[in-house]
Amino acid sequence: MSKRDFYEILGVSKTADNKEIKRAYRKLAMKYHPDRNSEDPDAEEKFKEASMAYEVLSSEEKRSAYDRMGHAAFENGMGGGGFGGGGGGNFQDIFGDIFGNFGDIFGQSRGGGGGRSRRGSDLRYVIELTLEEAVRGCKKEISFTAPAPCDTCDGKGAKNASDIVTCQTCHGQGQVRMQQGFFAVQQACPHCGGTGKQIKNPCSDCHGNGVKDKSRTLEVSIPAGVDDGDRVRLAGEGEAGGAGVQNGDLYVEVRVKQHNVFTRQGADLYMDVPVSITDAALGKEVEIPTLDGKVKIKVAEGTQSGKLLRVRGRGVTPVRTTMKGDLICRVVIETPVNLTREQKDLLRQFQDTLDGDSKHQQSPHKKSFFKKIGDLFD
């Protein structure tokens, strides 16, 4: 019986790079893993087939041998080290590298109540804060649903401690070696889920998993100075790992709501300060808000629109620093609207006074603008 081409099994071209091969294998492994397909008799065979293909194509040496000689490269110990004994790659390393900490996907046993072989999965919770809460720090109560230890069996998965016995398939090792022809791969025992234990009489409430979904409420302390996208880690507050398995962590991710006055950039805060055309021309002291109360800033005589005024120490102290940023005020000069006839006449009279050299001296940007235009035609 002819063997299927490894590239065909993974659904990749012969020029595929390692990332494409890994991505293709991960997709197939998640689709056909025996612990997710206990009702499909062909799933385990397809899973092993994909694993064999990946073990060859993910190794530069074995892939090179396979490209030259095909399946014959691994028969009778030829080329690439073969797969028998200790010469081949460790499947558990491959599997762990790809799936990392997602024990919740493959951890449950098919044999009636096996536990999980990896720590519980980490959880993510997004929390919205106002700018003031993010800058000053706060306490927030969050509610969510996640797997937690079963109350009925205290997370053991069994009615009684005596119901937990050594797995007879792997003899307590948690690993089995699967042989198919000249291929041999090591994987988590399908009967105990890699724990090395089996449960004779599973807990009727959690069905031997040791965990159940529960609604939880926690108070989270948000440190002062957090910014949008920062995460607060709560160790051990993630998904419960089940009997004898470490819990995952809970990561609370911060989302800062848009403020109607301030914009934050790192340690500094920015704001627009509207100034009338007369105050900008004559100069004035203007009162502005900050997160710590009101302060006054000096708008100098002749200030132009867009001028940045810095108020030191009125910004933010980011997390893990002691240096406080500044408040940057951008002057926005407001042009008056809905003028009366008398006001328009007064402005025209004022405009008439801006003549000759003094006109350019009193309008420096306009002088610079016309000079630049003149330079274009010189």
Curated annotation (Swiss-Prot):
InterPro entries, per the entry: DnaJ, DnaJ_C, DnaJ_domain, HSP40/DnaJ_pept-bd, HSP_DnaJ_Cys-rich_dom, HSP_DnaJ_Cys-rich_dom_sf, J_dom_sf
GO biological process, one term: DNA replication
Keyword Zinc in record: yes
Residues forming coiled coils: none
Disulfide-bonded cysteines: none
Molecular function in Gene Ontology: ATP binding; heat shock protein binding; unfolded protein binding; zinc ion binding
Zinc finger (CR-type): 137-215
Family: Belongs to the DnaJ family.
Protein name: Chaperone protein DnaJ
NCBIfam families linked: DnaJ_bact (TIGR02349), PRK10767.1 (NF008035)
Main location: cytoplasm
Cofactor, free-text remark: Binds 2 Zn(2+) ions per monomer.
Function as written in the Swiss-Prot or TrEMBL entry: Participates actively in the response to hyperosmotic and heat shock by preventing the aggregation of stress-denatured proteins and by disaggregating proteins, also in an autonomous, DnaK-independent fashion. Unfolded proteins bind initially to DnaJ; upon interaction with the DnaJ-bound protein, DnaK hydrolyzes its bound ATP, resulting in the formation of a stable complex. GrpE releases ADP from DnaK; ATP binding to DnaK triggers the release of the substrate protein, thus completing the reaction cycle.
UniProt binding sites for Zn(2+) 2: 167, 170, 189, 192
Organism: Psychrobacter cryohalolentis (strain ATCC BAA-1226 / DSM 17306 / VKM B-2378 / K5)
Entry's free-text remark on domains: The J domain is necessary and sufficient to stimulate DnaK ATPase activity. Zinc center 1 plays an important role in the autonomous, DnaK-independent chaperone activity of DnaJ. Zinc center 2 is essential for interaction with DnaK and for DnaJ activity.
J domain residues: 5-70
Cofactor(s), by name: Zn(2+)
UniProt-annotated binding residues for Zn(2+) 1: 150, 153, 203, 206
Keywords in alphabetical order: Chaperone, Cytoplasm, DNA replication, Metal-binding, Repeat, Stress response, Zinc, Zinc-finger
